[in-house]
Amino acid sequence: YKGIIFRKTYTQLGELLDKADSYYPRIFPGAKYNSQQHVWKFPSGARIYFAGMQYTKDRTKWQGWQFDFIGFDELTHFQFDEYSYMWSRNRPSGPGTRVYMRATGNPGGIGHGWVKDRFVTVAPPMTPVKKKLLLPQPDGSTKEVYRHRIFVPAKLTDNQALMDNSPEYMLNLAMLPQKEREALLDGNWDSFSGQVFMEWRNNPDMYKIRKH
């Protein structure tokens, strides 16, 4: 079994790595972290990698890899091409393993537009969206398969543990400018509706340099 969790940059993984360091050894005695390879190794042989994908070209670093689980933390920090490329890496690394992807995210960010279109507005919350795919078979026929996705909304008030441990955090969010406050406190995906073509914003990989 192999899994991988992405943040936009490796530095942003700090909090996730701290939580993994707190949870994994207690739940899986004998689990160890290799700081050079950025991977947790478990006695069963399973591995969980942590990685950044700062530039779109970084996605090809994972060409030839296979992961049973792929996770994106703060999905709106990524472009669609970075996310969709990893579909090709989401395949079983052994018999009987479950293959799936998960992502978390907040409104705003360079990927706000495509994340909203793909998950938020495509169907009501908590409603599975099923897409039919036709896979070619060796005999020339096709096989129907389905991929599912779903949007699970959550607000700060849904995290009772955080509310109890840090009640001042809500006050901090309440003091933000209106658009940021509506996005982060209320989970409002329409607060950034005026940001058109967000996937193209400040992305050096998309620039075309004219040759002279």
Residue ranges with predicted function:
Residues 1-13:
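Conserved RecA-like ASCE P-loop NTPase motor core of nucleic-acid helicases/translocases
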Residues 158-212:
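ATPase catalytic-site recognition across NTP-hydrolyzing enzymes
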